[in-house]
């Protein structure tokens, strides 16, 4: 991968390594590859919608492209990069641990992911693809898809789920057992806290998804009737089970980005800790906790009674409180800093701005009376893309910008990286901001054609997506150029406020051969 430590043993290092840095690098490469495939599919969607009329010629094909785009981006791009990549690389370093708690389990949890991805790609090529959307609702996924594509998608989700659960157990035990004795819970860095809460949510919610899709599998193949109303089942059970996983999942995607933004704001300001760091920890815990009890706000239109809708509306609005605490704490941390024009500052400010917009549209959608009108329109699509495409993905870009030199030992071109930010910022906003208006005017999701009245919004969105794709290519060029340019990372301006910066410059193959005792932290008594 890079010039910071020599690999011995060729290919077997990548296949068999139990070193957290090697496995983290594999996760990054896998996430990049999946992200490129997912982005290509999103471009296909935007080209189809660029003007009225048909490009793909089949609604089933269009829906299977949407399904593949969602599953690739969620399970094979954001999660491997955030938790597998940044988590594997930085968590042991931030805890003063020599490696992960179960190094070989770590290796297994990575190699389950390419298997899962090949299965979901196979599903796209069987019987006109799996056109169910990533939610895989019955009866569309049972009677509506009699072929093998949905079965392949279910096996893919099983593989990805097992991988995530194994990784989550590993991260939890590492945080609990391998923490340096001088780092108490309240002194752990916020990135470690976000990863810890994230993996807790994974362990809590993924078995529920596994149960739901296993029941779906038996409904399809073994003549059971869990979700078939004609024989006493209820498709709403599936929706409740799926969204009990699906809502914590969106917090699983965004929480590590919160941690990255917290670390970046420390880096930028040179402060010892984030403003209100204990409050930030409680906000992370609150988001994780409340995120588990609001799942049915995805289901306002299925005929829930008024009391249930009132509860889920209120509970969903409560999540805005800890999220607001985080946003204002980041701003308070950045307040008073010496403003130096650099890519990291741009990414952090961009994240805070875009995530806040996504959060505000979320507060609107949490109202059940409004959501009944806006449900399954492009307003919802714009909301979750502002939180994920412009939140989690900007978090990944921020993490790469922050830790690139730390991980590789090379320095990227700062002006080029700033150009990537400007292009990406313009592109994603041009893509998703106009679609809010299309959604308010009643433009529904998951249709491959539309009336001419919506064409202005769609043309703007399609141009924006092309700008974003160009920005992505420029980003990859910047990273490759940093290797080719071979500008060695010599020193940093960073004020030392974490165990990872006690290492000499960039990172070598094995860190913390003996336990460090981190003396600038208040000791536990």
Curated annotation (Swiss-Prot):
Main localization of the protein described in the UniProt heading: mitochondrion
EC identifiers of the protein: 7.1.1.9
Record-linked Pfam families: COX1 (PF00115)
Biological-process GO terms, alphabetical: electron transport coupled proton transport; mitochondrial electron transport, cytochrome c to oxygen
Keyword vocabulary terms for this entry: Calcium, Copper, Electron transport, Heme, Iron, Magnesium, Membrane, Metal-binding, Mitochondrion, Mitochondrion inner membrane, Respiratory chain, Translocase, Transmembrane, Transmembrane helix, Transport
Cross-link 1'-histidyl-3'-tyrosine (His-Tyr): where in chain: 247-251
Main enzyme class: translocase
GO cellular component terms, semicolon-separated: mitochondrial inner membrane; respiratory chain complex IV
Molecular functions per Gene Ontology: cytochrome-c oxidase activity; heme binding; metal ion binding
Cofactor binding mode and count: Binds 2 heme A groups non-covalently per subunit. Binds a copper B center.
Residues involved in Ca(2+) binding: 48, 53
Annotated positions binding Mg(2+): 375-376
Catalysis: reaction(s): 4 Fe(II)-[cytochrome c] + O2 + 8 H(+)(in) = 4 Fe(III)-[cytochrome c] + 2 H2O + 4 H(+)(out)
Binding site for O2: 251
Similarity-based family: Belongs to the heme-copper respiratory oxidase family.
Function noted in UniProt: Component of the cytochrome c oxidase, the last enzyme in the mitochondrial electron transport chain which drives oxidative phosphorylation. The respiratory chain contains 3 multisubunit complexes succinate dehydrogenase (complex II, CII), ubiquinol-cytochrome c oxidoreductase (cytochrome b-c1 complex, complex III, CIII) and cytochrome c oxidase (complex IV, CIV), that cooperate to transfer electrons derived from NADH and succinate to molecular oxygen, creating an electrochemical gradient over the inner membrane that drives transmembrane transport and the ATP synthase.
Stated name of the protein: Cytochrome c oxidase subunit 1
Organism: Ascaris suum (Pig roundworm)
């Amino acid at each position: 991968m890079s010039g910071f430590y020599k690999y011995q043993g060729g290919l077997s290092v990548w296949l068999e390594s139990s070193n957290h840095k090697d496995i983290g690098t594999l996760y990054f490469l896998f996430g990049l590859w999946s992200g490129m495939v997912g982005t290509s599919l999103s471009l296909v969607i935007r080209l189809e919608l660029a003007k009225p009329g048909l490009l793909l010629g089949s609604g089933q094909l269009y829906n299977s492209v949407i399904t593949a785009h969602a599953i690739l981006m969620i399970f094979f791009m954001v999660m491997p990069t955030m938790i597998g990549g940044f988590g594997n690389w930085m968590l042991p370093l931030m805890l003063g641990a020599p490696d992960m708690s179960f190094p070989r389990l770590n290796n297994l949890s990575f190699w389950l992911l390419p298997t899962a991805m090949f299965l979901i790609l196979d599903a796209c090529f069987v019987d006109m693809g799996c056109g169910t959307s990533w939610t895989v609702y019955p009866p569309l996924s049972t009677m509506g898809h009699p072929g093998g594509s949905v079965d392949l998608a279910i096996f893919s989700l099983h593989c990805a789920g097992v991988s995530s659960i194994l990784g989550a157990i590993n991260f939890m035990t590492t945080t609990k057992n391998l923490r340096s004795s001088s780092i108490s819970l309240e002194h752990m860095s916020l990135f470690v806290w976000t990863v810890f809460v994230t993996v807790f949510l994974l362990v809590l919610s993924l078995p529920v998804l596994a149960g739901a899709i296993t029941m779906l599998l038996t409904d399809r193949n073994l003549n059971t009737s869990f979700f078939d109303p004609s024989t006493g089942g209820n498709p709403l059970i599936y929706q409740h089970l799926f969204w009990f996983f699906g809502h914590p999942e969106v917090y699983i995607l965004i929480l590590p980005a919160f941690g990255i933004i917290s670390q970046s704001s420390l880096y930028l300001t040179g402060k010892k800790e984030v403003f209100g760091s204990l409050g930030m920890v409680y906000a992370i815990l609150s988001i994780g906790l409340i995120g588990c009890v609001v799942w049915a706000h995805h289901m306002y239109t299925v005929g829930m009674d008024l009391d249930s809708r009132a509860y889920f509306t209120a509970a969903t609005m409560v999540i805005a409180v800890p999220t607001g605490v985080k946003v204002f704490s980041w701003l308070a941390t950045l307040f008073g800093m010496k403003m130096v024009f650099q890519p990291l500052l741009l990414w952090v400010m961009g994240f805070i701005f875009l995530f806040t917009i996504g959060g505000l549209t979320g507060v609107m959608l949490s109202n059940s009376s409004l959501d009944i009108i806006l449900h399954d329109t492009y307003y919802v699509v714009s909301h979750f893309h502002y939180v994920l495409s412009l939140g989690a993905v900007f978090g990944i870009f921020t993490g790469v910008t922050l830790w690139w030199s730390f991980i590789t030992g090379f320095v990227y071109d700062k002006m080029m990286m700033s150009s990537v930010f400007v292009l990406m910022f313009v592109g994603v906003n041009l893509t998703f901001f106009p679609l809010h208006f299309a959604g308010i005017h009643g433009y529904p999701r998951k249709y491959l054609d539309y009336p001419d009245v919506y064409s202005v919004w769609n043309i703007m969105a399609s141009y924006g997506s092309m700008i974003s794709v160009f920005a992505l290519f420029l980003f990859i060029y910047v990273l490759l150029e940093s290797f080719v340019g071979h500008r060695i990372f010599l020193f940093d301006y960073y004020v030392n406020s974490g165990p990872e910066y006690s290492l000499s410059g960039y990172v070598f193959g094995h860190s913390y051969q003996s336990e460090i005792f981190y003396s600038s932290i208040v000791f536990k008594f």
